[in-house]
A protein has these predicted regions:
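Non-transmembrane "mature" sequence context
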Residues: 2-20, 24-30, 34, 41-45, ...
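Short secondary-structure junction/hinge motifs that connect adjacent elements
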Residues: 50-56
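Heme-based O2/NO sensor domains and their adjacent alpha-helical segments
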Residues: 56, 66, 80, 87
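Short helix-coil boundary/hinge micro-motifs
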Residues: 67-68, 72
Length: 220
C-alpha cells in the first residue's frame, strides 16, 4: 500500500471514528458546531467548506460516512479541511486514534477475506461469529471485538499476506486453500474453519521463509 493510499485510509477512518463518537457524545457535537460557527466568522472565504460540514453533521451516521468516503473533490475536501481535531480533548483524541487503528486492521481483514474468496459462511466458521453480522462490517464496522475473536482475523490476514508471496496469481491462492494436504488429510480452508488456523499459518511461514526479501520484512 502506497503512502498516499494509507493517508487517505487513515483520514477516512479518523472521521468515521469521530462521527461515531459524536453520536454517543452530544457535548462533542456541540463543540464542533460551536467551532464551525466561529470559523464562519474568522474564515469567511472557507464558508462553502464549513457549510458542507454543518450539513454533514445533520445527516444520519451512515450517510455522513458515505459523504466523507466519497472519492470526489467534495469528499477529499471534507477530509482534508476538518473542524474536528481542534475541539477534541486529549483523552478523546487518543480514543479516536485507537479506533482508527482498529478500523484499518478491519479493512485489512476484509481485503484479505475478499482476496481469498471467503464467503460469509466460511468467515463465520473461522471467526466463530454470525455471518450476517460479518456482512455488515463494510458499512457498519463494530467498535471493538473480544480478544479471542481477533485470532481468526489475524490468521486470515497472515494467510493472505504469505500466499501473495508464494502464489501471486489470485486464482491459485483460492485453489491452494481448497486442495487437500495429505499430511493433514484436510484442506487448509477446512483447518481454518475448524479453529486450526495456527497449523496453516505455521506451515506457510516455513514455506515462505527462504523466499523472503528485505522488502517483505517489517521495518523498525
Amino acid at each position: 500500500m502506497d503512502a498516499r493510499t494509507l493517508h487517505e485510509m487513515k483520514m477516512t477512518a479518523y472521521h468515521r471514528a469521530v462521527l461515531r463518537r459524536m453520536c454517543s457524545n452530544p457535548d462533542l457535537k456541540r463543540r464542533v458546531v460551536q467551532h464551525l460557527e466561529d470559523l464562519m466568522h474568522r474564515q469567511p472565504d472557507m464558508a462553502p467548506v464549513w457549510e458542507a460540514w454543518c450539513a454533514l453533521l445533520d445527516r444520519p451516521e451512515a450517510e455522513a460516512v458515505a459523504d466523507l468516503q466519497a472519492d470526489s473533490v467534495e469528499g477529499k475536501r471534507l477530509r482534508m479541511v476538518s473542524p474536528v481535531t481542534a475541539v477534541l480533548y486529549p483523552a478523546e483524541r487518543a480514543m479516536v486514534w485507537r479506533c482508527v487503528g482498529w478500523l484499518i486492521f478491519l479493512h485489512h481483514y476484509l481485503a484479505a477475506a475478499a482476496d481469498l474468496g471467503l464467503d460469509l459462511e466460511e468467515q463465520a466458521a473461522i471467526l466463530g461469529l454470525d455471518g450476517a453480522e460479518i456482512g455488515t462490517w463494510s458499512h457498519a464496522p463494530p467498535e471493538r471485538m473480544a480478544e479471542e475473536r481477533l485470532h481468526g482475523l489475524r490468521q486470515v490476514i497472515t494467510v493472505r499476506h504469505i500466499l501473495t508471496i508464494l502464489k501471486p496469481v489470485l486464482s491459485e491462492r483460492r485453489q491452494w486453500l481448497e486442495t487437500v494436504n495429505p499430511d493433514w488429510e484436510a484442506s487448509p480452508l477446512a483447518l481454518l474453519c475448524r479453529g486450526e488456523g495456527a497449523v496453516v499459518c505455521d506451515h506457510l511461514a516455513r514455506q515462505v521463509g527462504p523466499r523472503l526479501r528485505a522488502a517483505d520484512l517489517p521495518r523498525c
